[in-house]
Amino acid sequence: FAPYLYGANYPHPLGGYGSGFQKWLWQAENGNFEPYTSCGNGSAMRVGPVGWAFNTIEDVLEYAKHSAESTHNHPEGIKGAQATAICVLLGRKGFGKEKIRSEISTRFGYNLNFTCDEIRDTYKWGGICQDTVPQAIVAFLDGNDFEDCIRNAVSIGGDSDTLACITGSIAEAYFGVPEEMYKEAFNRLTPHFKNVVTEFEEKFGNKILNNGNLTKKDV
């Protein structure tokens, strides 16, 4: 129900919604909240908070599934959300990149044995989890800090806003976000979303860096 509330309150976001979600909103307005069997990458791009709100792999898997299947109930849509949320959990818990790579490859069967340089010239646009979540994770794995990860994701091309969103959710948990970037993004939010973010971070934490030093942290 939450995706409908946000969609109804923000019907015309910059860039618009994906066609599947837009159709779902129209159906929901008439009382039909059935998910639309999507494996689109929207499930992965919105799931990052689950990796902050829960502290075990079992809980993160369960609630990432719940987050996804309200709209994206295709197995691949659920898997993409779960993989992203597990990356966030492991990143904020201090696990190394190779542990993250191994865990995701083993648990979800994603091939992460490539680099951004190797796919940049041939990667094509894809809007499903199978074509974006592994690439977004590798953009993080190849990065040296938060900004570097985002640049990697954008440089691949394709559905770059979603790629960068997925990559960024993992990179914050692992590296932290420079304070000036955090403030720039935060100040672009509506008052409602500023309140949502503030309340969430007060309860579950974040990683904000001031001159390389952690100023806020995981609670």
Q: How would you label these PLM feature ranges?
A:
Residues 1-219:
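Structured, active/binding-site neighborhoods that engage oxygen-rich ligands
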